[in-house]
């Protein structure tokens, strides 16, 4: 008997950065396949796993505020979780502002 599995990746990510000088914005572009969705970042306790971001510490770089979505999520009651849930379909951008103490020595490779 043979068994095969496939890793499903219904969300593809691209990351870009914009901004001048000391303050920059990291933009996480999510492309969501039809039939799938990406849960919002603020799902209530007892619900599904929310979308979250974690960042490594980089010397002379600090996070400014929280990751913010570019639009409000679609909201709908879920009988499975017995609560109102938010999610995104198709595409969504999440943004994180960073502050760089010395932009001349900051390089992305």
Residue ranges and their predicted role:
Residues 3-109:
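Extracellular/lumen-exposed scaffold segments
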């Amino acid at each position: 008997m043979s068994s095969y599995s496939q890793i499903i990746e219904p969300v593809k990510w691209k990351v870009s950065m914009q901004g001048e000088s000391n303050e920059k914005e990291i933009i996480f572009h999510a492309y969501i396949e039809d039939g799938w969705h990406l849960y919002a970042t603020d799902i209530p306790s007892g619900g599904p796993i929310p979308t979250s971001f974690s960042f490594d510490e980089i010397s002379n770089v600090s996070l400014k505020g929280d990751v913010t979505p570019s639009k409000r999520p679609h909201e709908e009651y879920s009988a499975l979780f017995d609560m109102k849930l938010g999610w995104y379909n198709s595409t969504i951008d999440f943004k994180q502002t960073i502050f760089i103490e010395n932009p001349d020595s900051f390089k992305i490779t």
